[in-house]
Amino acid sequence: MEFRLKELRKKRKISQLKLALDLNMNQNTISRYENMERQADYTTLIKFADYFDVSLDYLLGRTER
């Protein structure tokens, strides 16, 4: 499964630090999610989807929209 967090963040020119601060997370945690070293729980996935205004299916690489 493709996780589009890094793609979305880079497209919008947002640093890991800014994303972490905006979502009240640690930058290291964002890095681990992006590198698939850690899996985000459902609540965190919703935060990412809401932040980037995309569906969970898109965020998880299940759809192209």
Predicted regions and their residues:
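A short, Lys/Arg-rich alpha-helix, primarily the initiator
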Residues: M1-K11
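Alpha-helical residues within the helix-turn-helix
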Residues: K10, L21, D50
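Short, charged recognition helix plus adjacent turn
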Residues: K11-R12, L60-R65
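Short alpha-helical DNA-recognition segment
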Residues: I14-R32
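DNA major-groove recognition helix of helix-turn-helix/homeodomain DNA-binding modules
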Residues: T43-Y58
